[in-house]
Structures are given as C-alpha cells and as structure tokens.
Amino acid sequence: TPATSLCGGITKNTMKHDKSYLQIADVVAARSYCKRNKVGAVIVKDNSVIAEGYNGTCYGMPNQCECLNGKTREEVVHAEENALLKVARSTQSCDGATLYLTLSPCLRCARLIVQAGIARVVYRDSYRNLDGLGLLSRCGVTHEQLL
C-alpha cells in the first residue's frame, strides 16, 4: 500500500520507523553511566543502523560522568560524538543519514552533525539550550521533535 503523506511530507511509514529508531536510542541511552542525563544516539542510513552511541567518559577512564558537585565533567563524550566517531572509524558515511536522539543536540554537537553530512535529526526531549537546533536550521539540516 502506498504511504500516506502527513504534513511536511512525512509519511505514516516514516513516523513508524522514527518511533522505532527512537526506541533503539532509548535502549542505547540506558547503557550510559551518567547519572544526571542518559543520552542515546542512533545514526540510520538507507533504513539501516550504521552507528549508535551514548554519553560517557573516554576509553580508559573511570565511568564517572559527574564531578563531586554534580556537574558533567568536561571530558565526557556526548552520545552524538560517540556515534559520529564510530562512523568515522568505519567504512560508512553519514552523508544523507538521519540521526535519532533522546535529547536535542548542544551547539558543540550540532557543528559536528552539520559537518558530518547528517541530513535530518529526530529527537524526543529538548536540551535546555536550543542554540544547537538553531544552527541545524541555519545550515539546512531538518530536525523535528517526536514525543
């Protein structure tokens, strides 16, 4: 059966896939050792997951994302960064891919998303600072919140 187009050209089939990939991002986020915010990222290209990532510390460091004062350590790698770095270390490319996130990107990650060639970002929760979404808009990366 043909896909029924909803507003913005999104089809029911696309929405179904979007929800499924966000559920995968939830599972990935649960692997994070961070206490304050567990974030998951899934990169999908041609209907296949090519990478996933969650926020955490660098390889070889203790899995402690927060300082004693409760703030996130500077050396924590964001979920988007982990997923994008996995693609960079593989034979895959992010060109035209969709990134699924449990939390919208910060400005730092939005820059990487743009430069990696991600075409679309789907996220569930909004980060406290929306500068990252603003950059995506200015650079032509479509993004949408799916609750």
Residues of each region from the PLM?
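Zinc-dependent deaminase catalytic domain
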Residues: 1-147
